[in-house]
């Protein structure tokens, strides 16, 4: 039986290689073994997002933000997931927080501004 760490490493490698569906399988198994590490949940959220499974991605990024409320990347990805679900008004807050935490990130500002415009 593979350890949580081995599953996480394999899932992360698959994610980086672009095999999002295979990454999901490994990362979900890792999360089942240990649901606490935000690194596992963030990687799983990324894989789900790239596989266009936005509702599941949203749930993973939300779990990361609950544990690490200043994780700018998780906030950004939560906002992007909400945007992909058409929930633009809800996306405004996490995208605005991400942009405040990392003002040098132009992509954060771009999507924050899009959410503001779309929800207005």
Each language-model region and where it sits:
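Terminal, low-structured helical/coil segments at or just beyond the last alpha-helical repeat
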Residues: 1-4, 92-120
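Alpha-helical segment of the N-proximal tetratricopeptide repeat
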Residues: 2-33
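Structural signature of tandem alpha-helical TPR/SEL1-like repeats
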Residues: 17-29, 51-63, 85-97, 119-120
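Mid-chain, well-packed structural core segment of small domains
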Residues: 59-84
């Amino acid at each position: 039986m593979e350890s949580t760490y081995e599953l996480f490493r394999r899932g992360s490698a698959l994610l980086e290689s672009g095999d999002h569906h295979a990454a999901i399988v490994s990362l979900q198994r890792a999360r089942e073994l240990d649901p606490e590490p935000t690194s596992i949940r963030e990687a799983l959220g990324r894989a789900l997002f790239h596989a266009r499974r936005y509702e599941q991605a949203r749930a993973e990024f939300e779990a990361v933000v609950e544990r690490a409320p200043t994780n700018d990347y998780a906030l950004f990805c939560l906002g992007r997931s909400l945007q992909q679900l058409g929930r633009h008004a809800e996306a405004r807050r996490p995208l605005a927080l991400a942009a405040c935490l990392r003002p040098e990130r132009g992509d954060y500002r771009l999507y924050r501004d899009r959410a503001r415009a779309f929800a207005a």
